[in-house]
Amino acid sequence: LPHTQFMLMSATLGDVTAIAASLEEHTGAACDLVVDAPRPVPLSYDYVTTSLEGTVELAMRRGEAPLYIVHFSQDAALATAQSLANFGIASKEQREAIKEAAKGTSFSTAFGKILKRLLGCGVGVHHAGMLPRYRLLVERLAQQGLLPVICGTDTLGVGINVPIHTVVLTALTKFDGYKMRRLRAREFHQIAGRAGRSGFDTEGMVIAEAPEHEIENAKLMAKAGDDPKKLRKIKKKKAPEGFVTWNKQTFERLIETQPETLKPRLRITHSMVISVVEQGGDARTRVHDLIETSLQTPEEKAKLEVRADEIFATLIDSGVVVRTEVPPAPDAPTDAAPDIDYALTVLSLIHISEPTRLGMIS
């Protein structure tokens, strides 16, 4: 990027000093790093122990729509949308405008028929499992300000421009494909950062729902009031066994914690090596340079070098790649051994600076 003057990066990337240093090294130009730039629309945070329906109702009364209710499963998002559709979310004018804006969209599938009914009530659904035409329709209606509530997954937190005033997190945990775990700071800030519409709002709102057992306990406490006898008799519910829980302190910690530093994930693959070979020249050296100039740790670089050696050997043995012998150096003796070309090739594959490598030529 020698001619690039500005590189704008997401604030959720964490510490980017290593990236700035890499840019300086590759371009030869000084790189000034600007961090902690103020948000155009500041955020307010609230941790609530009301039911989700109650939270939505209160937010609507306070004029904090549109709301995006974040779930961590597609089924949960649809279930909430169907529940809220019975609460009269949209006004008559909004429902008529939605109906007009949705003309031309085919709702022929089973999910499409459900979505059509939900949209007619002012409730949208958004997740990666939807057909593109449905997802784009919801985004378009939201951009036009016609949907007071959208129920979806955390996909909206990644690169989709939909104006939202309030983000409601139904949980601070998610299943990552292996286990249930609490949200990481980067994930939280990506989702929370969707709140607040630049040019419309003076602030955005981020609300986190307490776990179900905590909400039930809050109801029991409210019912008992200030009566000491009733308060003593309360049997507080506990989190289910094996449940990964969270609390207000978890929420506050996520707010205060800076996003984790972005970690490089360079992989050397057969297709990558073949692509480099197709360019001609010393392919192995270019792969080495790619690894060496990456932001991986020294240990990771050593593993990538071993992996590159394995791939080159496999491609050569299978005949996919043919090794061209390196010509003798100009100052090489004329009576050099017949294997000098091979020795030079091997030497080019050995990086003496790596303490984890041992090369031997016989």
Provide a role label for each language-model segment.
Residues 184-221:
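Conserved segment of the helicase C-terminal RecA-like domain
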Residues 316-327:
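A short, conserved structural fragment
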Residues 74-149, 177-186:
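Conserved C-terminal RecA-like helicase domain
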Residues 3-7, 66, 146-148:
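Loop/turn-to-beta-strand initiation segments
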Residues 149, 156-172, 205-207:
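A short beta-strand element within the Helicase C-terminal
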Residues 350-362:
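Single conserved hydrophobic/aromatic residue that forms the stacking wall/gate
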Residues 17-83, 124:
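Conserved interdomain linker/interface between the two RecA-like ATPase lobes of SF2 helicase motors
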Residues 1-16:
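Conserved helicase ATPase motor motifs in RecA-like P-loop NTPase domains
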